[in-house]
């Protein structure tokens, strides 16, 4: 074979290999940029924030998934299965309106969790055939000229998903981060609502995300007693 031809072929092959190498570098670089990077975090800060958030979640778990806000059987303010909320209870947790409830919720849970709560609990759920679930709580506006102040009303037929008492050990341990989520481990004590003598201890792994004004829970914190549970 002609030496000049061989040289040309060698140059072409070398050029192709160089191009392939450059392409590989570019692809590898883009892939690396697309990879999820585990965020850095201050362990003590996350653990301290978790303790506060868990106490808030204890109240919200009761309101959203537990027995709910107590109500009074005032027939003058009743509407179907809705009755006015107990003002004494609301005052004890610093809530007067649904907006107050949302404020506490948004100080506790991530945007994603808040969105799900609002869609499934604070809003009625509809299908093509009509309503399939009524909002658990509604804000009632009585008007400026009415002697009765605005109030929250409670849907009295809402299902109670979690009745057991849940307590969180303040000794929280930050474990790791996965992407933007930081995971912590907390020891949870669950006391059966049917028999206070029955107690279960579990390790619950909870995710947190950092938003503009602080940390938020990004996973549920409720728990249920199981008779046959073994730790």
Model-found features: residue ranges?
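Gram-positive cell-envelope targeting signals
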Residues: 1-46, 56-57
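Mature, Sec-exported extracytoplasmic domains of Gram-positive
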Residues: 32-231
């Amino acid at each position: 074979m002609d030496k000049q031809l061989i040289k040309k072929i060698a140059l072409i092959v070398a050029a192709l290999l160089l191009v392939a190498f450059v392409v590989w570098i570019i692809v590898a670089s883009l892939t690396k940029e697309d990879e999820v990077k585990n965020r850095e975090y201050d362990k003590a800060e996350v653990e301290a924030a978790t303790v506060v958030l868990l106490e808030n979640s204890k109240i919200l778990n009761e309101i959203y998934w537990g027995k709910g806000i107590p109500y009074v059987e005032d027939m003058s303010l009743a509407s179907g299965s809705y009755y006015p909320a107990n003002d004494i209870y609301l005052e004890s947790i610093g809530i007067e309106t649904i907006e107050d409830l949302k404020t506490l919720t948004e100080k506790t849970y991530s945007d994603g969790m808040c969105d799900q709560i609002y869609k499934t609990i604070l809003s009625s759920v509809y299908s093509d055939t009509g309503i399939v679930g009524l909002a658990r709580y509604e804000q009632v506006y009585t008007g400026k000229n009415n002697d009765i102040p605005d109030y929250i009303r409670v849907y009295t037929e809402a299902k109670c998903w979690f009745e057991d008492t849940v307590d969180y050990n303040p000794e929280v341990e930050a474990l790791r981060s996965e992407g933007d989520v930081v995971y912590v481990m907390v020891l949870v004590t669950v006391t059966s609502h049917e028999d206070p003598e029955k107690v279960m201890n579990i390790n619950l792994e909870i995710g947190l995300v950092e938003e503009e004004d602080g940390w938020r829970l990004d996973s549920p914190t409720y728990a249920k007693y199981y008779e046959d549970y073994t730790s």
